[in-house]
């Protein structure tokens, strides 16, 4: 959503906290906001509601909102978050082992993915589609809400966990193609936990 830089954000109702889907009980939402998966990563910004009005999200730390979560305004009213339909791939496998293999290849490329019992859902990328089809997957283009699995480090806070490792391996596949992986990650090896 594009806003005029001269917008007076103080006139917008402020959302100051979040309730996870199902935590609101029977309290009805006074409004809804339909957001794509990348728009659901919020800390401080204006969000347009389905009725055209706006609220200022002003949270103490970044959060990744899920479909059905609620933004809680200062006056106690709730805004329900709806995951917007997005252009995604519906990826199917021959069996559970094949689905696990496909998930590994997707994860190895650090792609956001929705993981379900019988399919994987990712944002469209023609290069990844070709790779998956080359691995025997059935890939369909669909439009639906994208609800990726939240990673181990997506909780909105940092414990300072650290490790160092590198991947520098070459291997070949039974189908005659070979390629290498070479990338590294390094982090400070100190764990910092300040708990009072």
Curated annotation (Swiss-Prot):
Q: What is this protein called?
A: Urease accessory protein UreE
**Stated role:** Involved in urease metallocenter assembly. Binds nickel. Probably functions as a nickel donor during metallocenter assembly.
The annotated regions of Basic and acidic residues compositional bias extend over 156-196
> What's the family?
Belongs to the UreE family.
Phylogenetic lineage: Bacteria, Pseudomonadati, Pseudomonadota, Alphaproteobacteria, Hyphomicrobiales
Alphabetized NCBIfam families for the sequence: PRK13261.2-6
GO CC annotations on file: cytoplasm
Which GO terms fall under biological process for this protein?
Answer: protein folding; protein-containing complex assembly; urea metabolic process
Pfam families of this UniProt entry?
UreE_C, UreE_N
Q: Name one GO molecular function term.
A: nickel cation binding
Alphabetically list the UniProt keywords. Chaperone, Cytoplasm, Nickel, Nickel insertion
Compartments where found: Cytoplasm
Q: Specify whether Cytoplasm is a keyword of the entry.
A: yes
Q: Which InterPro entries match?
A: UreE, UreE_C_dom, UreE_N, UreE_N_sf
Extract the SMART domains matched here.
Answer: UreE_N
Coiled-coil features, chain-numbered ranges: none
Q: Return the SUPFAM superfamilies for the record.
A: Urease metallochaperone UreE, C-terminal domain, Urease metallochaperone UreE, N-terminal domain
Where in this protein does the record put region Disordered? 150-196
Q: Which Gene3D superfamilies match?
A: Urease metallochaperone UreE, N-terminal domain, UreE, C-terminal domain
Domain of life per record: Bacteria
């Amino acid at each position: 959503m594009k806003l005029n830089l001269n917008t007076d954000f103080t006139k917008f109702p402020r959302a100051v906290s979040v309730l996870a889907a199902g935590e609101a009980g029977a309290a009805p939402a006074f409004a809804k906001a339909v957001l794509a998966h990348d728009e659901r990563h919020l800390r401080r910004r204006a969000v347009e509601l389905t009725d055209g009005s706006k609220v200022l999200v002003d949270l103490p730390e970044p959060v990744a909102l899920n479909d059905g979560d609620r933004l809680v305004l200062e006056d106690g009213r709730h805004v329900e978050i709806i995951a917007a339909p997005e252009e995604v791939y519906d990826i199917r496998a021959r069996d559970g082992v094949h689905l696990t293999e496909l998930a590994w290849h997707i994860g190895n490329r650090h792609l956001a993915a929705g993981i379900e019992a019988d399919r994987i859902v990712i944002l469209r990328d023609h290069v990844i589609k070709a790779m998956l089809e080359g691995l025997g997957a059935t890939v369909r283009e669909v439009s639906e809400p994208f609800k990726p699995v939240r990673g181990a480090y997506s909780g909105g806070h940092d414990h300072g966990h650290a490790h160092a490792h590198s991947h520098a391996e070459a291997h070949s596949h039974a189908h005659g193609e070979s390629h290498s992986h070479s990338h590294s990650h390094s982090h400070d090896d100190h764990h910092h936990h300040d708990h009072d």
